[in-house]
Amino acid sequence: MQIFVKTLTGKTITLEVEGSDNIENVKAKIQDKEGIPPDQQRLIFAGKQLEDGRTLSDYNIQKESTLHLVLRLRGGMQIFVKTLTGKTITLEVEGSDNIENVKAKIQDKEGIPPDQQRLIFAGKQLEDGRTLSDYNIQKESTLHLVLRLRGGMQIFVKTLTGKTITLEVEGSDNIENVKAKIQDKEGIPPDQQRLIFAGKQLEDGRTLSDYNIQKESTLHLVLRLRGGMQIFVKTLTGKTITLEVEGSDNIENVKAKIQDKEGIPPDQQRLIFAGKQLEDGRTLSDYNIQKESTLHLVLRLRGGMQIFVKTLTGKTITLEVEGSDNIENVKAKIQDKEGIPPDQQRLIFAGKQLEDGRTLSDYNIQKESTLHLVLRLRGGL
């Protein structure tokens, strides 16, 4: 099969290989084509560095896959630099490089002036005149880059979702400026932001110094929606999602918002509030869901299905079931929804009364089938 190898210069090399070729063979083929010794080649696929003894098949490399070739300098090594935003920069260095050289390489890659860089390794700040070897920094070590602003400081802003944003500020910045910086980073308009520090809401016209906010302080960001409100959605894994909603939003809209945040298709979502499953066509206000209410999200597995139960009053109940559920289970679900004890329920499908011990599949009840519920009164026959 053919695979492609892309170099850092943007050149693409085409190789003829077998899935059973090991990475060493592939490096030999690259040497034949490009003259680069195997010991200077690092091959990357799907973000992983490939090991010489493993085969292409081991890494699920198939025809027309693209590998990335990074050169490893003789006597040189690669190190990683991790920023507070979580971005990782890869640098080619020598053990004899001093910290000043390393900062210059970071400036070349990221445009950050050396005098604004603080490099940390093993909990120590690195001094410009010392070398990587002085600090025992070896290949594939990770340094941490913290920005030092002239006269400035870093503060943290924590959102209700648990995300932490890092901001570069001055003590003289007013709260309005801080909200503008948050808008730059996160796209949240200032008029929807409420900032809290030490339990107090911060006023736009005051400065950070007025509130004694110092370097590495943490502010809390709460969103204020125009006419809207925040609600929480708790999943079975214990994760809590924060949503911005209006009381007039219907449940379908809410499921769409959850899909945007979490990628879960609406038809796999069941939302529960105050013990009731919420129906798509109804609104949050219909269920008296108010600001900071918590809904519970239960996933409906693709193996499951919905069926309908129609009462003599004409009301239709929607149930989440499996084909393997027995009729007793179904009656228990109806009791959960409607409060009708199972011993007062008679369920009819296709003209037949359904028996407790049998399953939905036994009666060929499929998705979106409609059962009829007839009440059997106590003392009745």
Swiss-Prot record:
Record's keyword terms, sorted: Cytoplasm, Isopeptide bond, Nucleus, Repeat, Ubl conjugation
UniProt cross-references to InterPro entries, sorted A to Z: Ubiquitin-like_dom, Ubiquitin-like_domsf, Ubiquitin_CS, Ubiquitin_dom, Ubiquitin_ubiquitin-like
Molecular function (Gene Ontology), one example: protein tag activity
Keyword Lyase: no
PROSITE patterns with a match to the protein in the record: UBIQUITIN_1, UBIQUITIN_2
Crosslink (Glycyl lysine isopeptide (Lys-Gly) (interchain with G-Cter in ubiquitin)) position: K48
UniProt record, GO biological process: modification-dependent protein catabolic process; protein ubiquitination
Compartments, as annotated in UniProt: Cytoplasm; Nucleus
Pfam families for this protein: ubiquitin
Ubiquitin-like domain ranges (all copies): 1-76, 77-152, 153-228, 229-304, 305-380
Cross-link Glycyl lysine isopeptide (Gly-Lys) (interchain with K-? in acceptor proteins), where in sequence: G76
Propeptide: 381
Claim: Nucleus is one of the keywords in the record: yes
GO cellular component: cytoplasm; nucleus
Comment field (misc): Ubiquitin is synthesized as a polyubiquitin precursor with exact head to tail repeats. Some ubiquitin genes contain a single copy of ubiquitin fused to a ribosomal protein. In D.discoideum there are 9 genes: ubqA: 5 copies of Ub and a final Asn; ubqB: 1 copy of Ub and ribosomal protein eL40; ubqC: 1 copy of Ub and ribosomal protein eS31; ubqD: 3 copies of Ub and a final Leu; ubqF: 7 copies of Ub and a final Asn; ubqG: 5 copies of Ub and a final Leu; ubqH: 5 copies of Ub and a final Asn; ubqI: 4 copies of Ub and a final Asn; ubqJ: 4 copies of Ub and a final Asn.
Summary of the function given for this chain in its UniProt record: Ubiquitin exists either covalently attached to another protein, or free (unanchored). When covalently bound, it is conjugated to target proteins via an isopeptide bond either as a monomer (monoubiquitin), a polymer linked via different Lys residues of the ubiquitin (polyubiquitin chains) or a linear polymer linked via the initiator Met of the ubiquitin (linear polyubiquitin chains). Polyubiquitin chains, when attached to a target protein, have different functions depending on the Lys residue of the ubiquitin that is linked: Lys-48-linked is involved in protein degradation via the proteasome.
Family: Belongs to the ubiquitin family.
Name listed for the protein in its UniProt record: Polyubiquitin-G
Gene from which the chain derives: ubqG
